[in-house]
Amino acid sequence: MALKYFNNRQLGILGDALDIAEDMTSNYFKLSVSQWKQHPFDVKTLSNSFGEDIKDNAFALLKKYMTVNKVEIEPLYKRREYYIICLQDHQILQALQRDRDLKLLPLLAYILTHELVHIVRFCKFQVRFETQKENSRTKEEKIVYQTTYEILRELSLPNLPYILGSYSPDRMNVDICRFD
């Protein structure tokens, strides 16, 4: 089966969803612009992904990287973590096709807010990215789900309450996020 990618209209909606997610997440955690810049991340879609970045059991894959250290230019202590949110277009589009009550903007706002909550928690050392034990990951997902719910519950977006109710950790049959 061929993978489905976001089209130009959907990419525009993705930009709007990212603006919402960044704004809501920074407000919740009370992050200033300079503090937010301390949590560097990027978003890529399926059209920029290949191989291990493509997953069939999640809406997004969160990857952690370290900036390249140029020994003669930059001391080791200046190396920084950054994150890439790899959206799984095909999984998101399939969910929209399967459930007519889902809409792209609120679903993407939810997914991106969820991922940003993970990033903030990792950067604030509230949890380690490298947590691999399934029970620890399940516990972390419940915390992130609850935080995402608190961030978005007052936001007025069509179909968002449906999404907030549908994607609780106890009801999910697809993961919002995988770590790699």
Task: Identify what each model region corresponds to.
Residues 3, 34, 130-135, 162-170:
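Peripheral peptide segments
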Residues 8, 12-19, 149, 153-180:
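Long, well-structured alpha-helical subdomains associated
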Residues 29, 120-124, 155-159:
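Long, hydrophobic, amphipathic alpha-helical segments used as structural scaffolds
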Residues 54-55, 95-100:
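Active-site-adjacent loop/helix micro-motif of nuclease/hydrolase catalytic cores
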Residues 82-96, 113-128:
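Short acidic, glycine/tyrosine-flanked loop/strand segments centered on an H-E-D-like triad
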